[in-house]
């Protein structure tokens, strides 16, 4: 039995049912942290005088790493490149992570929580870190638009299903 207060194994504060069984599915964020943050302001101070509206290129990626049977690290990578015809205004790259605990869940539900729900929970905090980094670099804070992680997740599942179906011989399900 986990010791009281062990956040990596004791995911719920409620004691198990009267028979001692712990069968309720549970998932949650145990810890959040900045794993890596890079800010480049390569053309300062000249870039502060540029009047042209910069073009923004925002990329994101989600990865997961299993720590143990109940805990995974979810990494949300966000890269922001701001450019004008005169050159790069700034570049911000962030790896924002969360330790996620999941217990008594099917693999399908764990996968959905890992790649849709956990990033949705982490994103507002990552967005704040990026906004603060851009502001601290001397520019107006950048407020990234919300991302529909669930919609993207469902779209990718559908694409994978279509690819699997396209590769199957006729007459097979």
Residue spans for each PLM region:
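N-terminal intrinsically disordered, cationic/polar leader segments
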Residues: 2-121, 125-173
């Amino acid at each position: 039995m986990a010791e009281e207060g062990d956040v990596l194994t004791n995911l719920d504060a409620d004691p198990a049912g009267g028979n001692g069984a712990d069968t309720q599915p549970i998932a949650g964020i145990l810890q959040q942290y900045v794993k890596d943050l890079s800010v480049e302001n390569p053309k300062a101070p000249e870039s502060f005088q540029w009047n042209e509206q910069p073009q923004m290129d925002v990329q994101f990626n989600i990865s997961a790493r299993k720590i143990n049977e109940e805990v995974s690290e979810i990494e949300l990578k966000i890269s922001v490149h701001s450019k004008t015809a005169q050159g790069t205004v700034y570049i911000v790259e962030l790896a924002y992570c969360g330790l996620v605990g999941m217990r008594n869940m099917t693999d399908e539900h764990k996968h959905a929580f890992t790649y849709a729900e956990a990033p949705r929970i982490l994103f507002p905090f990552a967005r704040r870190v990026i906004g603060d980094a851009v502001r601290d670099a001397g520019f107006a804070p950048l407020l990234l638009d919300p991302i529909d992680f669930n919609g993207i997740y469902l779209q990718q599942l559908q694409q994978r299903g279509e690819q699997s179906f396209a590769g199957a011989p006729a007459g097979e399900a």
